[in-house]
Amino acid sequence: MSLQSYDKEIFDLVNLELKRQCDHLEMIASENFTYPEVMEVMGSILTNKYAEGYPGKRYYGGCEYVDGIEQLAIDRCKQLFGCEFANVQPNSGSQANQGVYGALLNPGDKILGMDLSHGGHLTHGAKVSSSGKIYESFFYGVELDGRINYERILDIAKIVKPKMIVCGASAYTREIEFDKFRAIADEVGALLFADVAHIAGLVVAGEHQNPFPHCDVVSSTTHKTLRGPRGGIIMTNNEEYAKKINASIFPGIQGGPLVHVIAAKAVGFKHNLSPEWKIYAKQVKANAKKLSEILISRGFDLVSGGTDNHLILMSFLNREFSGKDADIALGNAGITVNKNTVPGEKRSPFVTSGIRVGSPALTARGMKEAEFEIIANKIADVLSDINNTDLQEKIKAELKELAHKFIIYDRATF
């Protein structure tokens, strides 16, 4: 029986979401459009199989084929990042980070990560996260120019003396210099852990500095710029750390892995290893650069004055409207972004003074600089007359027409 026949309520909602994804311009920096092949294997019979343990060391029988699947995912992941060991079982980036901490830290150990309000992530020590409750967390941030000051981080690290330094961000527009973080970690005797969830797709294409060999451990998600399924991975070159990480994931924080998702990760990695991937990653950066150039030319302030990667941060500290206002207005015009805090933030995190805008999803649809120039100007038009709902409706219709020239899915399920 088809989903439409059995559960029309869910079928209708899923297809409404398909329509939204086709009609709107997805510019949330952490979102992307995955491949049909990835979704096909996620919807396979692999969802039926329990496989507690690791390839060759399972607690269940009948794992001979899923062993092959997981090993393929591991091997492709290692090839992608140029590392010796990889764990592909984490169900998310947050669980990957939790697994790293559990493997290499003891409760109460000090960690030094990027402040959430400066572009870090909840799992980098934020007090509302388990990473900020189990461990003693300290923070570094960006300067008012929106850039990391590595000398300032060294000064903080000398005072804090952390067991681990966490580098990586969810809203940082410039290249992260892992070699400089390595020098800081060495000077204070700290472990160095990189969370490259946002930039992984650029890293594996050679469009961003690789965290290896500089970092002791690296985590990532497999969606975002990698365009794979939703999930996490952990990598290292240290065999002792690898064993501890494996134990920290299973049986530490997870039971049976999601075999259908691990298979989808393997399929995604095959895409990432293809020559076409480098073309995609270059285009992601080129599109973000075009976006930043146009918005600056239209008189808008960008944190750090531009971008080196896949995203920009627009600052409205000198405007009467907030990030929340901009988020809503652009949504009404058919452009999906998210409100975001900015350096020097004066509003609450529920309102903010900025928005985060990314290029990966629209690049996946096939859009290039010409389309991003159009889109950037439409963003500027909306924000220059933010209360003009008639203009928002007009632009929404225009952008829907543009979006329909770049349809990526013709159905909702695979």
From Swiss-Prot:
InterPro entries: PyrdxlP-dep_Trfase, PyrdxlP-dep_Trfase_major, PyrdxlP-dep_Trfase_small, Ser_HO-MeTrfase, Ser_HO-MeTrfase-like, Ser_HO-MeTrfase_PLP_BS, SHMT-like_dom. (6S)-5,6,7,8-tetrahydrofolate binds at L116, G120, H121, L122, E240, S348, P349, F350. It is found in: Cytoplasm. Pathway: One-carbon metabolism; tetrahydrofolate interconversion; Amino-acid biosynthesis; glycine biosynthesis; glycine from L-serine: step 1/1. Belongs to the SHMT family. Its cofactor is pyridoxal 5'-phosphate. Homodimer. PANTHER family: SERINE HYDROXYMETHYLTRANSFERASE (PTHR11680:SF50). The keyword rRNA-binding does not apply. The keyword Metal-binding does not apply. Its main location: cytoplasm. This is Serine hydroxymethyltransferase. Keywords: Amino-acid biosynthesis, Cytoplasm, One-carbon metabolism, Pyridoxal phosphate, Transferase. Catalyzes the reversible interconversion of serine and glycine with tetrahydrofolate (THF) serving as the one-carbon carrier. This reaction serves as the major source of one-carbon groups required for the biosynthesis of purines, thymidylate, methionine, and other important biomolecules. Also exhibits THF-independent aldolase activity toward beta-hydroxyamino acids, producing glycine and aldehydes, via a retro-aldol mechanism. PROSITE patterns: SHMT. The record marks H223 as: Plays an important role in substrate specificity. Coiled coil: none annotated. It is an enzyme of class 2 (transferase). The gene is glyA. One of its GO terms (molecular function) is pyridoxal phosphate binding. The modification N6-(pyridoxal phosphate)lysine is found at K224.
